[in-house]
Regions:
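Conserved short secondary-structure elements within globular domains
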Residues: 138-150
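Conserved small/polar residues in nucleotide/adenosyl-binding loops
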Residues: 159-163
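Short acidic, glycine-rich loop/turn motifs
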Residues: 25-35, 122-130, 165
């Protein structure tokens, strides 16, 4: 019968902690967005590692189905939340990125995807900042710049900016 010592012996490194991570957003090559990459990394308050799904194909055989793996559907959206500081650095950069893809005023923008897409990184860290695992979200760009909720009832909180992002795997 397993006991607590067996469990502790099998929980390598004490387990990966949800609050030990780093997000790095590299600006796209074709749009000047004015993002301080190092500062933006410090302002991240939450992120996710999206799920991975395989499709399933039902193959009928004499009144029953057997199931085999199918194609991988498009990946889920990757979402990251930032503290919004008083110079709105991250928000301004994301607005410039969006406007570079499709300008509000004249409905133009960069055409080549490599000019507005970039690689984004999430690193799971150990408690001493050793990188345990790195996830790379390739050809990413912001789908939405989420609303920033404002309220006079919130006396002791910061505003946050959430950024849902499309990517390739």
């Amino acid at each position: 019968m397993a006991n607590i010592d067996d469990f502790k012996a099998n929980l390598i490194g004490g387990g990966a902690r949800a609050n030990q991570f780093r997000v790095t957003i590299t600006p796209p090559s074709g749009i000047a967005i004015g993002l301080d990459v190092r500062r933006a990394s410090f302002l991240v308050t939450a992120s996710i590692l999206p799920a991975s799904t395989l499709g399933e194909i039902a193959v009928p055989f004499r009144g029953r189905n057997i199931y085999v793996s199918g194609d991988r559907p498009a990946p889920d959206v990757w979402s990251t939340t930032f503290y919004n500081d008083t110079d709105f650095m991250v928000r301004n950069a994301m607005e410039l990125w969006h406007n570079g893809i499709n300008d509000f005023a004249n409905n133009t923008g960069v055409i080549n995807p490599s000019d507005y897409q970039t690689d984004l990184f999430v690193e799971q860290l150990d408690r001493d900042d050793t990188i345990l695992k790195t996830y790379i979200f390739r050809a990413a760009y912001p789908l939405t710049i989420a609303a920033i909720d404002l309220s006079t009832a919130e006396a002791v909180s910061y505003t946050h900016l959430t950024l849902p992002t499309s990517f390739l795997v």
